[in-house]
Amino acid sequence: MKSGDVIRKLEKAGWKLDRVSGSHHTFKHPAVAAIVTVPHPRKDLGKGLVRQIEPISGVNLREG
């Protein structure tokens, strides 16, 4: 899965870009006490990273 796709799905679910540090974009959600960091730009994120982001964000990233 491309990092751009992950970022689009997070933003659609209400996550806002908080900061950028190098090639890592960090997102915050006003209703969730957590942050999500996505390396960007990357063509393919590992399956393990996508699986880790899903429960934190509450967003199903692997669904079409």
Question: Residues of each region from the PLM?
Answer:
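Polyanion-binding surface elements
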Residues: 1-14
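Short linear Ser/Thr-Pro motifs
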Residues: 3, 21-23, 57
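C-terminal structural segments of small proteins and small subunits
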Residues: 12-13, 30-64
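Major-groove DNA-recognition helix of helix-turn-helix-type DNA-binding domains
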Residues: 13-29
